[in-house]
């Protein structure tokens, strides 16, 4: 993650992972940790959800009892610059403690509140979700140049990544893997996805969203997320329809807009002994 993010978002938000690095943790003193806690761990920067078969009045009394005395920090919300796209392809090779060669290609995409967000997620599923996906069918089944492949989105408030990955065999040629992936990306960017592909992706999304609401925990987590990012818990009732409303043209436009070579990072991972050779 850190290798992709530091290259994709250089000098931008998300250049480093939210959890930080061991260097960050080791350099932080007690005073810094206490100030961070006071600034961010406050009731005006938190969302409390109580879900389940509860008595509303009793739950409110308990909330006031245990949390009512906590004072707001009045911390101003951080402002972040917009993500910069199409800054030129970044390519690098990393020799690490891996047994098999692997390729990661990441395209910068808009945040989860952007109008293209759902189209981008469906696009990633058409590319690399399951054995019938374009990537698996071409790279694993037909060309047999990789053991595994797939695609997914890493989405955040103002930006994210559509990540394509592929793990090769011991003697796989990573340049061939990158070339094959690029060919599939180019094809989906210049020709429309099929109705069948889009319907399959939508069905998977609908199943995942509805199954996630089958438990009290799932409902509570969804409500908290919708309020945190959208200030709208009502989205829990129309989230599925927002995906179902995405058209083939929406997916096509997203592919053309974001799946560009100048908008991506290409990382090749090779075993350390390859460098020695």
State where each predicted segment sits.
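M16 family metallopeptidases and their MPP-like homologs
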Residues: 1-23, 45-51, 101-110, 140-245, ...
């Amino acid at each position: 993650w850190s290798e992709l993010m530091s290259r994709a978002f250089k000098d931008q938000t998300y250049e480093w992972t939210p959890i930080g690095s061991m260097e960050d943790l080791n350099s932080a003193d007690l005073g810094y940790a206490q100030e961070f806690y006071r600034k961010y761990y406050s009731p005006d920067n938190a969302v409390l959800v109580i879900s389940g078969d509860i008595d509303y009045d009793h739950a409110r009394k308990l909330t006031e009892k245990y949390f009512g005395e906590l004072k707001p920090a009045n911390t101003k919300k951080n402002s972040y610059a917009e993500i910069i796209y199409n800054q030129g392809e970044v390519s690098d090779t990393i020799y690490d403690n891996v047994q098999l060669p692997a390729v990661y290609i990441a395209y910068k995409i808009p945040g989860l509140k952007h109008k293209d967000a759902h189209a981008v997620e469906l696009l990633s599923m058409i590319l690399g979700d399951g054995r019938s996906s374009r990537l698996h069918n071409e790279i694993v089944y037909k060309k047999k140049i990789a053991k595994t492949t797939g695609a997914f989105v890493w989405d955040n408030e103002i930006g994210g990544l559509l990540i394509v990955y592929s793990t090769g065999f011991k003697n796989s040629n990573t340049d061939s893997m990158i070339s094959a992936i690029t060919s599939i990306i180019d094809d989906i960017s210049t020709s429309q996805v099929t109705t069948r592909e889009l319907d399959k992706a939508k069905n998977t999304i609908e199943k995942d969203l509805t199954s996630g609401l089958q438990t009290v925990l799932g409902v509570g987590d969804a409500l908290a997320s919708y309020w945190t990012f959208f200030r709208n818990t009502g989205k829990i009732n129309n989230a599925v329809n927002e995906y179902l409303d995405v058209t083939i043209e929406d997916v096509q436009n997203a592919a053309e807009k974001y799946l560009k070579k100048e908008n991506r990072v290409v990382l090749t991972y090779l075993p350390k002994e390859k460098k020695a050779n």
